[in-house]
Amino acid sequence: MLTFLHTADIHLDPPFSSLSPQQASKRREQLRATFQSMIQYIRDEQIPLALISGDLFDSPTPQMDTLRFAFSAMEAAQNCRFFISPGNHDYGSKVWDAFPLPQNVTVFRGGQLSFRTCRIGEHEVTVWGWGFETESLSKDPLSGFGGVDTRRINLLCAHCTLDKPDSPYAPISKKELQAAGFDYAALGHVHNADHMKKLGNTYYAYAGCLEGRSFDEIGKKGAYLIRLEKEGDQNNSLSFHAKRIRFT
C-alpha cells in the first residue's frame, strides 16, 4: 500500500500587512512552526511521498532565510520524496533557482503538463504536474492529454481551478480530469478543505490551507494523508483511504 501526504497553500512568508511589525513577525513564525510540525510528522510516520500543490510560499520573492528554512526542513526528511507544483503566488524562477534543490525535492516547471516516475517501496509511481511561470496561467494544462498508463500508480499534483473555464488560474474541467485517468488528483488553490470526491475512477480533493491566516480562513485546516493500493492495470481495483491531519 502506498502512503503519501497531500498539502497545499501553505503561504510561508506573508506580509500580514494589517498587523504591527511585531505581530506580523510572530504570525510568520507560527506559520513556519506549522510547516515544521508537518515535516516532523512525515519523519515520525516515515511517509515516503508528499505532494505540495502550489503556493508553498506567499510570493515569488520570499526572504532568503525562509527559502533556507523550507528547503532545509524538506531535506531533513530524507526518506520522503517531495513533489511541488508552483502556484500563482510562488511562480517563476526566483524562488526555485535561488538555491540548489535538495535531492529529494522535485519542482514542476512550465505551464505544460509533465511527469516524473519514481519507485516508492514496491510501487512504480508517476507524478504529474505543472508550474506557474507568472501569476496567471489561462491555458488548460490538461487540454489534449491522452490519458495515463494505468499499469502504474498515477498522481496529479496541481494548482488549478475546476470547471471555471474563464479562470486565469490553470482552468481544468471535471470531464478532462475524469478522462485523464489519474488515481488521485491532489489539488491546490482553494483554501477551504474539500471533501474527498470521485470522478469515474479518479479520487480528488483540494487540500485547503495548512493553517488559516485571517478571519475569513476558518474551518478545517491541515493536510490529507492518503493510502491507496492498486492491483494490476484496472483502475477499479483501487483500494483508497483518506484521513484529515491537523498540525496546529
Where in the sequence are the language-model features?
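N-terminal active-site segment of His-dependent metallophosphoesterases
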Residues: M1-F69
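His/Asp/Glu-rich metal-coordinating catalytic cores
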Residues: L49, D58-K221, R227
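Intrinsic-disorder/low-complexity regions
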Residues: R43, I153, Q234-N235
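C-terminal functional module detector
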Residues: F215-T248
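Generic preference for hydrophobic/aromatic residues in regular secondary structure cores
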Residues: M38, C80, V105-T106, A242-R244, ...
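Short, mixed charged/polar active-site loops
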Residues: T3, E124, S239-F240
